[in-house]
Regions:
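Consensus positions within tandem repeat domains that build extended binding/scaffold surfaces
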Residues: 48-49, 72-77, 95-101, 118-123, ...
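Glycine-centered signal
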Residues: 3-5, 115, 119
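Short, composition-biased motifs enriched in small/polar/acidic residues
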Residues: 3-24, 292-295, 301-302, 312-411
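BRCT (BRCA1 C-terminal) domain core and associated BRCT-interaction motifs
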Residues: 305-307
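Intrinsically disordered, low-complexity coil segments
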Residues: 51-58, 344-347
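Hydrophobic residues on conserved beta-strands that form the core of alpha/beta folds
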Residues: 22, 43-46
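Structural signature of tandem-repeat unit edges
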Residues: 15, 27-44, 55-70, 80-93, ...
Length: 411
């Protein structure tokens, strides 16, 4: 327990549960230890007592006891000289702007008791170099580490579900792994100009607007199959991006999503994509080929605006004309045949099972079937030479088998 004189330097209010909240401090500013109890009552909350450094410009260190469960709104906001913080092991919530603009704070340990961290909690802590969000944290507010320009390493706990603009302007951050607990990232890493590597977890469904805008060091990105939408400006200005893999569940690519990705040379659009926004690939100056695996998505004449290239589409897919997105179109041929996984002719018929073969003009194709993959006994059913873009095949004997598998090959 602190001496009586030291405790008298704090002002408290009594909470409904007979605990105390610190509301004011009048003592010397250098290093402060907040009492755990006073007059037999536990101190459980800190409410803006040091915020905006009102009379506390020299506060360099603070110890928060284990009795405290809540660090309130702007509790230490703009304590510019603060270099050391010890957070007690009972804190469950860190409020909005709690340590914002503590520009001398080099590191902070967030205990495993914390479950919620508010918006802008560590915004503009420009000396902060590392940060770890523990697995106990389920909710983080937007802009949590925004403008932490020295932050080079961050660990995101496995219970976080949403990341908003939490790392915007973290210009020293070089790599990040987004855990599988996260379902949405929205504007999270905008202007992280040193970010060279990112791993997106397999539960993310939305890569929101501006998420990786101006990440000019990012060279490759794999968007997992869990993602259904890529927002506007999501990768705008990623000038070093040379390779992007778009997952097979993406249905929409937003306006200007890959604008000014000046080192991107080709892109493959999966058959799940139904819409591409205006200028999605505007000024991708090295992009000369776009490969489409499915039917023609909706998109205006500006999709590839400003550059020259060709949009290639798979034979047998629908909706294509002689131009798409401002580019001429052409059939996409491959040296080996392929069974189209969607579109016309796939599935049971009145007298068998049918599918369409594509990508193998003017070469012979053998269709084989197997009733049991365990024994691997593949039997030839037909040999055809594709004289056009596609060939329709129907197995009239498929109804004689409880299950049947198919493959095609060139003899």
């Amino acid at each position: 327990m602190l001496p009586v004189v030291a405790q008298a330097q704090f002002t408290f209010i009594t909470n409904a549960d007979n605990t105390l909240t610190v509301t004011h401090y009048t003592g010397p500013p250098w290093t402060v230890t907040i009492p755990a109890t006073t007059n037999g009552m536990f101190v459980t909350s800190i409410d803006g007592v040091f915020g905006n450094s009102s009379g506390k410009p020299g506060l360099t260190g603070v110890t928060i006891p284990d009795s405290v469960t809540n660090i309130g709104f702007a509790a230490f906001n703009s304590c510019y000289s603060l270099t050391n913080v010890t957070i007690g092991n009972s804190v469950t919530s860190i409020g909005e702007f709690a340590f914002g603009y503590c520009t001398s704070l080099p590191n902070v340990t967030i205990p495993n008791s914390v479950t919620s961290i508010g918006q802008n909690a560590f915004e503009n802590c420009t000396s902060l170099t590392t940060a770890a969000i523990p697995d106990s944290v389920t909710n983080i507010g937007g802009a949590m580490f925004q403008l932490c320009s020295s932050l080079a390493s961050v660990t995101i706990g496995n219970s976080v579900t949403t990341i908003e603009s939490d790392f915007t302007g973290c210009t020293s951050l070089t790599n990040v792994t987004i855990p599988d607990s996260v379902t949405s990232i929205d504007g999270a890493f905008e202007n992280c100009i040193s970010l060279a590597s990112v791993t997106i977890g397999n539960s993310v469904t939305n890569v929101g607007d501006y998420t990786f805008q101006s990440c000019s060091s990012l060279t490759t990105v794999a968007i997992p199959d869990s993602v259904t939408s890529i927002g506007s400006y999501a990768f705008n200005g990623c000038s070093d991006l040379t390779n992007v893999t778009i997952g097979n569940s993406v249905t929409s690519i937003g306006n200007w999503a890959f604008r000014y990705c000046t080192n991107l040379t080709n892109v493959t659009i999966p058959n799940s994509v139904t819409s591409i926004g205006s200028a999605a690939f505007f000024r991708c100056t090295r992009l000369t080929k776009a490969f489409f695996l499915g039917n023609a998505p909706s998109g205006d004449t500006t999709v590839f605006n400003g550059e020259s290239g060709t949009a290639y589409y798979v034979p047998g897919t629908l909706g294509w004309t002689n131009r798409f997105g401002g580019w001429p179109t052409a059939l996409w041929y491959q040296p080996t045949p392929k069974i189209l996984g969607s579109g016309y002719g796939l599935g049971a018929t009145s007298n068998g099972f049918a599918f369409t073969i594509s990508w193998a003009t003017n070469i012979p194709v053998v269709v084989e079937a197997c009733a049991d993959l365990a024994n691997g006994n593949w039997c030839p059913l037909a040999t055809n030479t594709l004289t056009s873009d596609t060939n329709y095949f129907n197995d009239s004997n498929s109804t004689n088998y409880p299950s049947r598998f198919y493959r095609i090959r060139s003899p």
